[in-house]
């Protein structure tokens, strides 16, 4: 039975993010890494999240926190609304909205993630969360104000 990839690509999981999460392939760019990391959150795969965090970030120390978070979070969807990178610079950025339910309340992570390429592999470094006013347009592209969309 085939299942669509949780990353929102509308492609079957086995043909989309599974090869990266399973370790069969290395994500070719920051957008694929971002999408596969989202899948790892959905599928509660702390090993993949830690493996794809840059080693300088000390992600292994976050394992217990990641696993505890899995128990309380249901991921609802991912929208990638901007991505840019240059292989020559070995740095890339992906902006996204990840929607979830936690403790019975809906929420969203709106982030511009930073990625670094080392030895042919992209790694997540960190992310910044832009500040939006409640009446600003939602960055997901819905056309709604943030207070009526991802900022609820």
Swiss-Prot record:
Protein's recorded name: UPF0225 protein YchJ
Family: Belongs to the UPF0225 family.
A Pfam family of this chain: YchJ_M-like
């Amino acid at each position: 039975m085939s299942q669509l990839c949780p990353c929102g690509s509308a492609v079957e999981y086995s043909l989309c993010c599974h090869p990266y999460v399973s370790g069969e392939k290395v994500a070719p760019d920051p957008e694929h890494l971002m999408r596969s990391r989202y899948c790892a959150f959905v599928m509660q795969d702390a090993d993949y999240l830690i493996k794809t965090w840059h080693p300088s970030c000390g992600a292994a120390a976050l394992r217990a926190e990641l696993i505890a978070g899995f128990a309380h979070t249901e991921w609802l969807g991912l929208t990638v609304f901007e991505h840019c990178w240059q292989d020559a610079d070995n740095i890339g950025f992906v902006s996204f909205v990840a929607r979830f339910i936690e403790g019975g309340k809906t929420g969203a992570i709106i982030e511009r993630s930073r990625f670094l390429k080392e030895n042919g592999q992209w790694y997540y470094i960190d992310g910044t969360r832009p500040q939006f006013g409640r009446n600003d347009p939602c960055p997901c592209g819905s056309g709604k104000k943030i207070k009526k969309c991802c900022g609820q």
